[in-house]
Amino acid sequence: MTNIRKSHPLIKILNHSFIDLPAPSNISAWWNFGSLLGACLGIQILTGLFLAMHYTADTATAFSSVTHICRDVNYGWLIRYMHANGASMFFICLFLHVGRGLYYGSYMYIETWNIGIILLFTIMATAFMGYVLPWGQMSFWGATVITNLLSAIPYIGTTLVEWIWGGFSVDKATLTRFFAFHFILPFIIAALVMVHLLFLHETGSSNPSGINSDADKIPFHPYYTIKDILGLLLLIFLLMSLVLFSPDLLGDPDNYTPANPLSTPPHIKPEWYFLFAYAILRSIPNKLGGVLALILSILILAIFPLLQLSKQRSMMFRPLSQCLFWILTADLLTLTWIGGQPVEHPFIIIGQLASILYFSIILIFLPMFSLLENKLLKW
């Protein structure tokens, strides 16, 4: 009798994806973040579901319903903070996952990479809409500022913004539709993840050396299942440490004040994981230019396969490109810091320089250094 995992139509798919999948024998812990992102998505969907059972998407009661969850619902505070900090863990894993892809040349699997970029945009949209739901000060003003950016689109901008708002300002209609979208998008993300995995399993995973690993594959289970479980335990440890010891560490105190359209907070800023893009947006004095730079700061990932001029796929044996990669990382951290600062000297100029450096490294220096390293190979 054939093993059920190899014959059953449904279990067979799972078997080929997670059990008998041939995996390179030398992939490091940087390859753990895919499974961690899957775990984060699962945590977010579950905690979100339980929050939705008690939340009301109405301007009059949204803020007090979140308060009610934290005070009156059994372990409501735990579910709420796991959901809020789970988003932070999600983005930490996302940034590390994308960084791994850039460092080891995973972007050469173009279909997988492009679906990944679509996933990134979808997750960012979901997180933004989720931040609006508690209806605190930063929720309201964040929603107002970010949706208002669409008014920079020539001719149709203002109409588009009012269409998204469902009125002439961010109000009840906006909150209700944001809740609807915030609920449905994670399931769309889950479907996109399936497509992401489908494309990945067409080629198999890359590996740190960047060379073909067909000659040396090992089964995913038990080798990488046990490795993923270790990663998952560390993720849960970090998440629960954050939730139980300092749940508001990454949040904004302004969001504990109910939304008031008549009082603007002194510094409107998004959650920490959007600050780098927010800093790039603010560094351009023109509204439309800023919006374009904001979108391009992430969309630029799509042109990495075109900028691959090196004869080696991975950066493992390319010290000059490695230096640039870590300068880019430092630059992104600088942008994240600047995004959280007020718009005044010297932060404005630092933000502008960091933004110029961000695009210069990707568009000019990385391809240039790749060609230089190709020359060095001939010596």
Swiss-Prot record:
Gene3D superfamilies: Cytochrome Bc1 Complex, Chain C (1.20.810.10). It comes from Graphiurus murinus (African pygmy dormouse). It comes from the Eukaryota. It is found in: Mitochondrion inner membrane. This is Cytochrome b. It is a multi-pass membrane protein. Belongs to the cytochrome b family. Binds 2 heme b groups non-covalently. Heme b b562 binds at H83, H182. One of its GO terms (biological process) is mitochondrial electron transport, ubiquinol to cytochrome c. Its main location: mitochondrion.
